[in-house]
């Protein structure tokens, strides 16, 4: 069959008629200069990926940057907002109620540039929890009131599970357990930041996360279209009828019925639009001469709440499982991290089954858990995650991987105390040994984005991530530096620590609640 050429902006794109050709081109590009221990793994993983993923983007050196700290993330956000010319599009769980400086920064950008448009997508339950007091919705409403919804399009996604008796019975403090808009996308013109961080003061100061900046118009366009699609399944903040109020509507322009009116029809319409987006995206395949591009990035997402139960077209879970199941020899290592350590059983099983000689799991110490010494029921969450860590170590022992897989707790001071930090990073790194140093591992694959790889991430929430595969030595060194920066605040934890340290004792009630409510954590 002949191949048709689709003319777009650089990098070039081509429509592919054969999935086998698609896979072989990527293999030639990546394996030609890849570190030799990783070649066979790369060949296997690219064959596997082509069955599941329809879209990828090629990057040249210096088109991906890793942001080092919360303060750098905040400074970069403000800088990008101020310099944006055409569009700012942001997806986050929530906007902190004290973030007036960020709102002012956006307002100033809109004032000085009449061509600029701003799009926000937040979670509708988390973003309105404090109403009528100050909250995400009231802050965004002030922008809409000043500039109008034509220039400031603010959307609030509400899970379709928030319906019927659940809407009436479940208190505001707990309704987030039904499902959330959890994507973290920060787009500015032709650049985009993918992260796990939200928009509040702790994420800008002392809450450890990860942040990658991608400089590509095509990549930014993809996430902008994704942002707009999920926004079209969401409520909109429009100009209030009374100054200071918040006016939230379901726009007639939305392509689906309001979920509160007909949940089944909403899911049918939304899932079809999502499936169309994921399928149409297969036509955006960047192809170039072998070796020209050093990095390939695959967007992967999880939209389980919007798909029928047995017809989930999401791409994240299957991709993560493929990454891990294709590790077949000891020349590959991995590091896994999640601040909220309630790992999906299938992912855990795949991690434990890998034939690694050295691998790390990084999770938050109880003293770095954002719920440490919080009020009410949430004060039990650090204990719940501690219990899950112990169960993981028991599984490691059961698999006879005690010498190969190390659980490490991250701690930097004590959260909510002077100079104390919390831990919110999540991700996966897959590494090979550096050819120049037989004792050193260097990543050539990482996953960056919003997912905590938990049971709820694959059942209740909307997640978006990116899988990066690279042979760019500078980027690999940056990835290694990022990982080392996290590891420097960790210490290994063993089953013996749980036996000897009374502070690691978890009560029976917390254990039972963790087992019952595990899907919500």
Swiss-Prot record:
It comes from Saccharomyces pastorianus (Lager yeast). GO terms for molecular function: ATP binding; CDP-diacylglycerol-glycerol-3-phosphate 3-phosphatidyltransferase activity. CDD domains: PLDc_PGS1_euk_1, PLDc_PGS1_euk_2. SMART domains: PLDc (SM00155). This is CDP-diacylglycerol--glycerol-3-phosphate 3-phosphatidyltransferase. One of its GO terms (biological process) is cardiolipin biosynthetic process. Disulfide bonds: none annotated. The gene is PGS1. Signal peptide: none annotated. The active site is at residues 182, 184, 189. The lineage of its organism: Eukaryota, Fungi, Dikarya, Ascomycota, Saccharomycotina. It catalyses: a CDP-1,2-diacyl-sn-glycerol + sn-glycerol 3-phosphate = a 1,2-diacyl-sn-glycero-3-phospho-(1'-sn-glycero-3'-phosphate) + CMP + H(+). GO terms for cellular component: mitochondrion. Residues 177-203, 419-457 form the PLD phosphodiesterase domain. ATP binds at residues 91-98. Gene3D superfamilies: Endonuclease Chain A (3.30.870.10). InterPro entries: PGS1 (IPR016270), PLipase_D/transphosphatidylase (IPR001736). Keywords: ATP-binding, Lipid biosynthesis, Lipid metabolism, Mitochondrion, Nucleotide-binding, Phospholipid biosynthesis, Phospholipid metabolism, Repeat, Transferase. Belongs to the CDP-alcohol phosphatidyltransferase class-II family. PROSITE patterns: PLD (PS50035).
């Amino acid at each position: 069959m002949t191949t048709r050429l689709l003319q777009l902006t650089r990098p070039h794109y081509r429509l592919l008629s054969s999935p086998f050709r698609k896979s072989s081109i990527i293999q030639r590009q990546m394996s030609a200069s890849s570190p030799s221990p990783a070649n066979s793994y790369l060949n296997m993983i690219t064959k596997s990926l082509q069955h599941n993923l329809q879209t990828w983007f090629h990057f040249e050196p210096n088109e991906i940057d890793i942001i080092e700290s919360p303060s750098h993330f905040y400074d970069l956000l403000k800088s990008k907002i101020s310099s944006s010319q055409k569009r700012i599009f942001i997806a986050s769980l929530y906007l902190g109620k004290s973030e007036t400086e960020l709102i002012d920064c956006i307002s100033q950008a809109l004032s000085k540039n009449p061509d600029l448009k701003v799009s926000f997508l937040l979670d509708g339950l988390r973003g309105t929890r404090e109403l009528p007091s100050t909250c995400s919705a009231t802050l965004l409403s002030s922008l809409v009131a000043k500039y109008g919804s034509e220039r400031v399009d603010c959307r609030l996604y509400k899970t379709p599970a928030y319906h019927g008796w659940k809407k009436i019975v479940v208190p505001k403090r707990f309704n987030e357990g039904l499902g959330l808009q959890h994507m973290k996308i920060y787009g500015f013109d032709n650049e985009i930041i993918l992260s796990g961080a939200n928009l509040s003061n702790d994420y800008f100061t002392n809450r450890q996360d990860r942040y990658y900046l991608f400089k590509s118009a095509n990549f930014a366009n993809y996430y902008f279209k994704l942002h707009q699609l999920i926004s079209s399944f969401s409520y909109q903040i429009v100009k209030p009828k009374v100054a200071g109020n918040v006016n939230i509507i379901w726009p007639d322009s939305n392509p689906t019925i309001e979920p509160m009116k007909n949940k089944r029809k909403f899911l049918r319409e939304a899932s079809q639009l999502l499936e169309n987006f994921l399928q149409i995206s297969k036509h955006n395949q960047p192809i170039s001469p072998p070796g020209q591009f050093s990095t390939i990035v695959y967007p992967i997402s999880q939209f389980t709440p919007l798909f029928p139960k047995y017809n989930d077209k999401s791409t994240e879970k299957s991709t993560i499982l493929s990454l891990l199941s294709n590790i077949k020899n000891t020349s590959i290592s991995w590091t896994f991290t999640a601040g909220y350590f309630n790992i999906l059983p299938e992912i855990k099983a795949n991690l434990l089954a890998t034939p690694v000689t050295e691998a790390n799991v990084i999770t938050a110490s109880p003293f770095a858990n954002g719920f440490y010494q919080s009020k009410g029921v949430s004060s039990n969450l650090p204990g719940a995650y501690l219990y899950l860590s112990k169960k993981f170590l028991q599984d490691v022992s059961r698999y006879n991987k005690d010498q190969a897989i190390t659980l490490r707790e991250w701690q930097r001071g004590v959260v909510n105390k002077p100079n104390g930090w919390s831990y919110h990073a999540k991700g996966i790194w897959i590494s090979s040994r550096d050819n120049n140093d037989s004792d050193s591992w260097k990543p050539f694959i990482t996953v960056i984005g919003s997912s905590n790889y938990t049971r709820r991430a694959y059942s209740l929430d909307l997640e978006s991530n990116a899988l990066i595969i690279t042979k760019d030595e500078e980027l690999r060194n940056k990835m290694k530096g990022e990982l080392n920066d996290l590891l420097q605040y960790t210490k290994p934890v063993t089953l013996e620590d749980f036996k000897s340290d009374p502070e690691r004792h978890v009560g029976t009630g917390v254990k039972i609640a963790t087992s019952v409510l595990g899907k919500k954590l």
